[in-house]
From Swiss-Prot:
It comes from Mus musculus (Mouse). Residues 899-908 have a biased composition (Basic and acidic residues). This is SLIT-ROBO Rho GTPase-activating protein 1. Homodimer. Forms a heterooligomer with SRGAP2 and SRGAP3 through its F-BAR domain. Interacts with CDC42 and RHOA. Interacts with FASLG. Interacts (via SH3 domain) with ROBO1. The F-BAR domain mediates oligomerization, binds membranes, and constrains plasma membrane protrusions. The gene is Srgap1.
């Protein structure tokens, strides 16, 4: 009984699907018929226009009686058509048909003829209509080819859905069958067990053997059916997932075709038709206006209708005339099979890894396709604009023919010399057809690419929702630093308005990488709240814990400039600024704009300089935020430079956008600097309420650095004693450069290659060893905690001022990369995680720390002397914060304060010991040693603090469980939000979200007020508790070849280049 009902169920589902596909196929055929009918109507209309002007030219010398007969003839002809009756009933005429009717009405008013007018009709207007008719037919044929291609693609998608649906039905049926067989085997096993419970002393020996063998057979059969059921169940889940993904992609493709592609196809059919018809009729109008001024009233009506020749409105009317053909169909719904209640993509454990891999592949593929599609789209739009320029050329004015009293022959020669010149026509037509061919080729490429993007995006979005990875945005808005206590006082009369400065500062801190900023609108309610707060004299953006939406803050900034009574660019300068477009050389154009803007008031010029410097900085992140100078100009052009009402809004807006784009790109050339114009200047590097200088600022040349710190001691690799380490977890190297080892293996470490890697040896092989997978034997008690606590010891020494370090101290595993490699890393680097920025120093530059060296003394818990070891020198060697890599990457100078190790540790776990750096003290920039008493006092305080923390650690270790690097971090993030005044690490999920799929260059700027990102020893776990491997595997560093005469690479507290680590 189950088999017939199952087949009946399958047939019903398939029949319903085939019926829906059949309706779509019929709809596609009907659409093609409608387009063909539209083209035939246009050709017939153009033929009528040709006949009309030909007849009108023949009887132009007759009296008004003959003209009236002509008008009546064509009016009767149009009234007899079926389409005319429909148009008359609906009162919804297409703009070309409306022009045709008004033209016939105008003919009734004509009462006079002229030879010049007859010549213009025969040799100018009729030829235009012939060309329009040819163009319309050609456009329709090319559009028809694209339509057939789109129809085939759509049917392929529907067939694919049909195949996937049947596959899903088949696997689900097999799963149900396997389940029933498994249940049957279980019942047989239960029966056999029941029999085996009978007393065995009444059973003969032969029967006992038979029962045992039957029990074994039933058990084997049950195991086979259990395996078969599991296999079929997995296949059913995968088939259902594939069905749901294909279903989502199919619905997206169908929706895109009906909403976007159909509109584009109709535009292709209309390409140049209205514009060319506009030109032909304007030629007629020009002749009529010069022939007799008494006919102006009637001709004004026709001119108004010609001006209303609008392809968009005609397209809307045309689609409304045939709603059944152009209405999008209903979305395909998921058809559950045999009581299957799961209607979503399943992310269960057997398929979760596969779905995550597929999601990553889709994301990577989509990123590439979107870039390619955007480039093709720009090319298509530029080509379309070229075609529109060709078909909208204003060559319809024939007023020159009526300026003097001439004979018919002279008029004919004049006309033929202008528009009808054969070489001119041939060249123009050839250019137009060549451009049209290129346009259709690019349009086809764009439509095919966008179709693929639509399908992949639909699958990606569904997988993203299923896997629950859509929360990256909230991590990107975490606090990036604490507010400087010396924030500058701003009164109500400040040069830069408070609302402008606060919005720009907020975007600088939290929104430089925000995709679609200024283009995506924010919440209107939030925008009004922020605006009202500023109007009350408050600053709602001063609180760094505020969770305002970036799009809303950007909307407030645009709303402020839009609401100015006097625009930032005065209306009196609008014409002069627009005229700069004629200058092709961008640098000369910028100089011309500079001359015009220097005439503006000083206050306006300062605000302009501040705003456009910010927009230029924002455009440097166009790879992340998708807002290049052109897109920013589109958003700010209408706001900063509104087009006067007397100007053409459409044509002028493109020129306005080009002017604003030029100012954004060449703002440094256009606006005077701080020496020429005193006033606030936009700072790229902002922290809290204060700012520090741009990362481009120079702290001295490399030669100066060498001279100032040339006496820094070095330690070569030969002088280093190997360190012994024990593996905490199993590790398999991902390349020949990485070492593989088992848990508990002994390794020898030579020196630290980066924050995540060691150079070491295992089983006679040299290579890289990941720091998180090992326990360093003699480093846990000396230098690991020393590095992690160096900032605490530096904080007690007073403010840190600018200093220079030797170029020899800039030895980092990634410092000597080639420029081309760094350039590639900068291009594809993702936005770094937010971290604290250093406070501003007295001279206006970001503070720069000198390297720290350890003295050659020993240390124990009872002595204030400091430890000394060659490895200490290697680990304490600094890196110049103002390295060329850092200067080349603006806005990222302070973002490496959060390291991988910090993100994997408990926030509240105290360090084992504090240690201070001896030798060159970080509190001074003149390389002078401290007073011995001061050093002794500082060391004593540090050691007392370390002892107290050791006692506290011992107390906590008896209560708390061993830390789990994943669960503990997640629990802290969930229960205790990160305060704005700390640089505690984010959760591992945050690191995953920030790092994405590409490595990035991470740098930091040392500060006396912030915690250093260094290597802290983890708390030893309790006995019996098994540690887990790190949540994230470090990406191997690409190490350059070291010079034997140079010291080995060492980690630094400066801006370590993390471009090669994960």
């Amino acid at each position: 009984m189950s088999t017939p009902s199952r087949f009946k169920k399958d047939k019903e589902i398939i029949a319903e699907y085939e019926s829906q596909v059949k309706e779509i196929r019929a709809q596609l055929v009907e659409q093609q018929k409608c387009l063909e009918q539209q083209t035939e109507m246009r050709v017939q209309l153009l033929q009528d226009l040709q006949d009309f002007f030909r007849k009108k030219a023949e009887i132009e010398t007759e009296y008004s009686r003959n003209l009236e007969k002509l008008a009546e003839r064509f009016m009767a002809k149009t009234r007899s058509t079926k389409d005319h009756q429909q148009f008359k009933k609906d009162q919804n005429l297409l703009s070309p048909v409306n022009c045709w009717y008004l033209l016939l009405n105008q003919v009734r008013r004509e009462s006079k003829d002229h030879a010049t007018l007859s010549d213009i009709y025969l040799n100018n207007v009729i030829m235009r209509f012939m060309q329009i008719s040819e163009d319309s037919t050609r456009m329709f044929k090319k559009s028809k080819e694209i339509a057939f291609q789109l129809h085939e693609d759509l049917m392929k998608v529907l067939n694919e859905l049909y195949t996937v649906m049947k596959t899903y039905h088949m696997y689900h049926s097999e799963s149900i069958s396997a389940e029933s067989k498994l249940k049957e085997a279980e019942k047989q096993e239960e029966k056999q067990i029941g029999r085996s419970g009978d007393p065995v002393f009444h059973i003969r020996l032969e029967e006992r053997h038979q029962r045992r063998s039957s029990v074994k057979k039933i058990e084997k059969m049950k195991e086979k059916r259990q395996a078969k059921y599991s296999e079929n169940k997995l296949k059913s889940i995968k088939a259902r997932n594939e069905y749901l993904l294909t279903l989502e992609a199919t619905n997206a493709s169908v929706f895109k075709y009906y909403i976007h592609d159909l509109s584009d196809l109709i535009d292709c059919c209309d390409l140049g038709y209205h514009a060319s018809l506009n030109r032909a009729l304007r030629t007629y109008l020009s002749a009529e206006y010069n022939l007799e001024t008494s006919r102006h009233e009637g001709l004004d009506i026709i001119e108004n209708a010609v001006d209303n020749l609008e392809p968009r409105s005609d397209k809307q009317r045309f689609m409304e005339m045939y709603p059944a053909a152009f209405c999008p169909p209903m979305k395909f719904e998921f058809q559950s099979h045999m009581g299957d209640e799961v209607c979503q993509v399943s992310a269960q454990q057997p398929v979760q890894a596969e779905l995550m891999l597929r999601n990553q592949q889709l994301q990577s593929r989509l990123a590439t396709l979107k870039i390619e599609s955007e480039e093709v789209k720009k090319t298509t739009e530029a080509t379309l604009q070229t075609i529109q320029d060709m078909v909208t050329i204003e060559d319809y004015d024939v007023s020159e023919c009526f300026q003097h009293s001439r004979s018919t022959e002279s008029v004919k020669s004049t006309v033929s010399e202008t528009y009808l010149s054969k070489p001119s026509i041939a060249k123009r037509r050839a250019n137009q057809q060549e451009t049209e061919q290129f346009y259709f080729m690019k349009l086809r490429e764009f439509l095919e690419g966008s179709n693929l993007i639509t399908k992949l995006q639909a699958k990606h979005d569904l997988l993203q929702r299923t896997l629950g990875e859509g929360h990256r945005a909230e991590y990107m808005t975490t606090s990036r630093g604490r507010r400087n206590s010396h924030a500058r006082h701003q009164d109500s009369g400040q040069v830069i308005p408070l609302i402008v400065e606060s919005c720009i500062r907020f975007i600088n801190l939290y929104g430089l990488q925000h995709q679609g900023i200024f283009r995506v609108s924010g919440s209107q309610v939030e925008v009004n709240d922020i605006k009202n707060s500023f109007e009350r004299g408050e600053n709602p953006l001063s609180d760094e814990q505020s969770n305002h939406d970036i799009n809303s803050v950007a909307g407030v900034l645009k709303l402020y400039f839009r609401g100015l009574e006097n625009p930032l660019f005065p209306k009196e300068r609008f014409t002069d600024l627009i005229s700069c477009i004629r200058i092709d050389n961008l640098y000369e154009r910028a100089l011309h704009i500079r001359k015009l803007l220097l005439t503006l008031p000083r206050s306006v010029l300062i605000v302009m300089r501040y705003l456009f410097a910010f927009l230029n900085h924002l455009s440097q992140y166009s790879d992340e935020n998708m807002m290049d100078p052109y897109n920013l100009a589109i958003c700010f052009g209408p706001t900063l430079m509104p087009v006067p009402e007397i100007q053409d809004q459409v044509s002028c807006q493109a020129h306005v956008n080009e002017i604003v784009k030029t100012i954004i790109i060449h703002h440094e050339t256009i606006f005077p600097d701080a020496k020429e114009l005193d006033g606030p200047v936009y700072e790229k590097c902002m922290a809290g309420g204060d700012y520090c200088d741009s990362p481009y600022s120079e702290h001295g040349t490399l030669e100066e650095v060498d001279q100032d710190a040339g006496t820094e001691p070095h330690t070569s690799e030969d002088e280093c004693e190997p360190i012994e380490a024990i593996a905490k977890f199993d590790y398999v190297g991902r390349s020949a450069r990485e070492l593989s080892f088992k848990k508990g293996a002994s390794l020898l470490l030579y020196h630290r290659a980066s924050e995540d890697w060691w150079e070491g040896r295992h089983n006679g092989i040299d290579g890289l060893v990941p720091h998180q997978y090992i326990v360093v034997q003699d480093m846990d008690d000396t230098f690991s905690d020393t590095l992690s606590q160096k900032a605490d010891s530096e904080a007690s020494s007073g403010p840190v001022t600018e200093d220079k370090s030797s170029s020899k101290d800039m030895n980092s595993p990634t410092d000597r990369h080639s420029d081309s490699y760094l350039a590639r890393q900068r291009k594809r680097g993702e936005p770094p995680p937010p971290g604290r920025r250093p406070g501003r120093t007295s001279d206006g530059h970001c503070p720069l720390h000198p390297p720290h060296a350890l003295s050659n003394s020993s240390i124990d818990l009872g002595s204030p002397n400091l430890a000394s070891h060659p490895r200490g020198l290697l680990q304490n060697r600094g890196l110049n914060n103002d390295s060329p890599e850092r200067r080349r990457r603006p806005g990222h100078g302070s973002l490496t304060n959060i390291s991988r190790h910090d993100s994997l540790k408990k926030i509240d776990s105290p360090p084992i010991r504090r240690s201070t750096s001896s030798g060159q003290y970080t509190g001074f920039n003149d390389h002078k040693p401290l007073d011995p008493e001061t050093i002794a006092q500082d060391i004593e305080e540090t050691m007392n603090t370390a002892l107290n923390e050791l006692r506290e650690l011992e107390r906590q270790s008896t209560v708390k469980h061993a830390p789990d690097v994943v669960l503990d971090t997640l629990e802290q993030v969930k229960n205790s939000p990160t305060p704005a005044t700390s640089t505690e690490s984010l959760s591992p999920l945050h690191n995953v979200a920030l790092r994405g799929s590409e490595p990035q260059i991470r740098r930091s700027t040392s500060s006396s007020s912030e915690t250093m990102s260094t290597f802290k020893p983890m708390v030893a776990p309790r006995m019996g508790v098994q540690l887990k491997p790190p949540a994230l595997r470090p990406k191997p560093a690409v190490l350059p070849k070291t010079n034997p005469t140079m010291g080995p690479a060492a980690p630094s507290q400066g801006p370590t280049d993390k471009s090669c680590t994960m």
